[in-house]
Curated annotation (Swiss-Prot):
Gene3D superfamilies: Periplasmic binding protein-like II, Porphobilinogen deaminase, C-terminal domain. The porphobilinogen subunits are added to the dipyrromethane group. The lineage of its organism: Bacteria, Pseudomonadati, Chlorobiota, Chlorobiia, Chlorobiales. NCBIfam families: hemC (TIGR00212). Its cofactor is dipyrromethane. The keyword Lipid metabolism does not apply. It catalyses: 4 porphobilinogen + H2O = hydroxymethylbilane + 4 NH4(+). It comes from the Bacteria. The keyword Lyase does not apply. Keywords: Chlorophyll biosynthesis, Porphyrin biosynthesis, Transferase. This is Porphobilinogen deaminase. The gene is hemC. Tetrapolymerization of the monopyrrole PBG into the hydroxymethylbilane pre-uroporphyrinogen in several discrete steps.
């Protein structure tokens, strides 16, 4: 058994929370192990002037950490699973999916105003095409403004009056103790989350069996089934850039239910579908369900929506 572990992480407040959480959870099971953090600056932390939709977000927050992992400078990497591309580099694997936090998105607004009550043409900040598409489908008048930077930076921009409202993931807001700023938590029938939202993905080298065995103890089986189904759906649909896709799976007593959304950026076209599979006994079967739902969405016309978006990537 290893006596030391080095965790690779970004240096943003949320990333540090995630790494410290992982360290603390591992220490509960391995109290004598020395666990340290190595901070890595990623491309996504540096390129803050352009919208994610223009530069693409495939691995922007993970590739640089993965280089350290492949170079054996760290033993594991802790990511927000929603930032992890659905195909990991050769030699690396997502070994553990931590128990998921609430997957919903939230509205932060002046005076606690809810989405439906925001004034006409309100300035709404989000960097996500997924959120933009679903927002515009219910509030086509909104003036969508791009926002980048860590959570603290976004709250500062909001407090400085740059926007009337902004949309964030509940998980990050809760983890950094900003819950008292939430104006509204949006239900899944209005806003499906990003694939893997709310979960952490712990990445290791495939050939590092000792580390894989150590961190596997943090794996949450239900979360793994759900996230592997969602990631399989996204992998089957995606073509290498940020696109408006949302998904949310639940799993209980062998039954997986997966909801998914594909929409146009302007919110005028939205496809939703769902699938339920029973008797599942392996995460691989959950992935098969994700692929099956992706195929149904393609039959509905998702391919036409996605090909149009990819032309602008």
């Amino acid at each position: 058994m290893k006596k030391q572990l080095i965790i690779g992480t970004r240096s943003s407040p949320l990333a540090l929370w995630q790494a410290e959480f992982t360290k603390a959870e591992l220490s509960k099971h391995y109290p004598d192990m020395e666990i340290t953090l190595k901070l890595v600056k990623t491309t996504g932390d540096v390129l803050l002037d352009s919208p994610l939709s223009k530069i693409g977000d495939m691995g922007l927050f993970t590739k640089d950490i993965e280089k350290h992992l492949l170079a054996r400078e760290i033993d594991l990497a802790v990511h927000s699973l929603k930032d992890v591309p659905t195909s990991t580099p050769e030699g690396l694997i997502i070994t553990s999916f931590t128990e998921r936090e609430d997957t919903r998105d939230v509205i932060i607004s002046k005076g606690g105003v809810k989405l439906k009550d925001l004034p006409p043409n309100a300035r709404m900040a989000t960097s996500s095409l997924r959120r933009m598409s679903q927002l515009l489908s219910v509030r086509p008048d909104l003036d969508i403004r791009d926002i980048r930077g860590n959570l603290n930076t976004r709250f500062q921009k909001f407090d400085d009056g740059e926007f009337d409202a902004m949309m964030l993931a509940y998980a990050g807001v809760y983890r950094l103790n900003f819950s008292d700023r939430i104006s509204e938590i949006l239900p899944h029938d209005m806003m499906l989350p990003a694939v893997g939202q709310g979960a952490l993905g712990i990445e290791t080298r495939v050939d590092d069996e000792q580390t894989r065995e150590i961190v596997r103890i943090l794996n949450h089986s239900t979360t793994e089934y759900c996230c592997r189904a969602e990631r399989a759906l996204l992998r089957h649909l995606q073509g290498g850039c940020q696109i408006p896709i949302g998904a949310y799976a639940t799993f209980s007593n062998g039954t997986l239910k997966l909801l998914a959304f594909v929409g146009s950026v302007d919110g005028k076209t939205a496809l939703r579908n769902e699938i339920t599979k029973t008797g599942l006994t392996s995460p691989e079967q959950a992935e098969e369900a994700g692929i099956a739902l992706a195929e149904e969405l393609l039959k509905q016309g998702a391919d036409a929506i996605l090909s149009q978006i990819r032309k602008t990537c």
